Swiss-Prot record:
Enzyme class per UniProt: oxidoreductase
Active site (record annotation): 125
Claim: Nucleus is one of the keywords in the record: no
CDD domains: lytB_ispH
Disulfide-bonded cysteines: none
Name listed for the protein in its UniProt record: 4-hydroxy-3-methylbut-2-enyl diphosphate reductase
Task of the protein: Catalyzes the conversion of 1-hydroxy-2-methyl-2-(E)-butenyl 4-diphosphate (HMBPP) into a mixture of isopentenyl diphosphate (IPP) and dimethylallyl diphosphate (DMAPP). Acts in the terminal step of the DOXP/MEP pathway for isoprenoid precursor biosynthesis.
Length: 283
């Protein structure tokens, strides 16, 4: 059974940078916290906890003088301000692509634009982006949501960094159809687009797909969705222990990809587990 790994599976630049900052902070031996999970990988969060880097939900949980790391998804503007007011040492591990989306929203809002964010309203990245708007701001998950928005004379559009280009295009088209001045910033991460494109091609060339990543990871869930639309025999796992031999009955080629928050050691473990399966002995 041939196992084919997508070229760009695993950590993207922003996640690699965030985890590196977190592990460097852990090596100092000082009390270190992350505001929320540093990335959407329970296994990485657990490993950091074992090294003394503890996730907290609120700045008030950290004593004055402590170190707090801003997660890769970013945080709300008021949370960052609260950390500064509390005299904490702030290590900002916000992904540069997310930071750019925050900056665009702040600028557009000051220029009188109503903001439309394309994404998942409950995702921490989107909640952080929204907080930088000084005026009206709306989160839409699809072009159908645009129909429910009020009329706007000036619309500024940004996207959650893990959205697909097709999704952003559909929302922009729907906004343009309503009239008014529209300014769009493509804030989708290049790594997201590359991974999604690779996943489509790989899913079309194999008998079964395995997508590795946190079940709470938006970009991993999106990869699994994209693959499943092309290949129903697609399975989303977090770790190797979740692999089921029955998935590979009659399979000649297995495609493997992984979300941007998935560390290399987990990818290697999953591939080793799949490679050890003798498909001819599956009953």
């Amino acid at each position: 059974m041939q196992v084919i790994l997508a070229k760009h599976a695993g950590f993207c630049f922003g996640v690699k940078r965030a985890t590196q900052l977190a592990f460097e902070a852990a090596d100092t031996g000082s009390e270190t916290y992350t505001l929320g999970p540093i990335i959407h990988s329970p296994q990485v969060v657990q490993r950091l906890e074992e090294m003394g880097v503890i996730p907290v939900e609120d700045v008030s949980e950290v004593e004055t003088g402590g170190t707090i790391i801003i997660r890769s998804h970013g945080v709300a503007a008021e949370e960052l301000e609260a950390a500064v007011r509390a005299n904490l040492e702030v290590v900002d591990a916000t992904c540069p692509f997310v930071k750019k989306a925050q900056e665009h929203v702040a600028t557009l809002s000051k220029e009188g634009y109503d903001i439309v964010v394309v994404g998942d309203a409950v995702h921490p990245e989107v909640q952080g982006i929204v907080s930088y708007a000084a005026g009206r701001v709306y989160v839409v998950s699809s072009d159908k949501d645009v129909e429910r928005l009020p009329r706007m004379s000036k619309i500024g559009i940004v996207a959650q960094t893990t959205q697909s280009f097709e999704h952003l295009h559909d929302v922009v088209t729907a906004c343009l159809a309503r009239g008014g001045e529209t300014r769009v910033y493509n804030t989708i991460c290049d790594a997201t687009a590359v991974r999604q494109d690779e996943a489509k091609k790989l899913a079309g060339a194999v008998d079964c797909m395995v997508v590795i990543g946190g079940f709470n990871s938006a970009n991993t869930k999106r990869l699994a969705q994209i693959c499943r639309e092309l290949l129903p025999r697609t399975h989303h796992v977090e770790t190797a222990c979740q692999i089921d031999e029955q998935w590979f009955k009659g399979v000649e080629k297995v495609g493997v990809t992984a979300g941007a928050s998935t560390p290399k050691w987990i990818i290697d473990e999953v591939i080793d587990r799949i490679s050890a399966i003798d498909k001819d002995k599956i009953s």
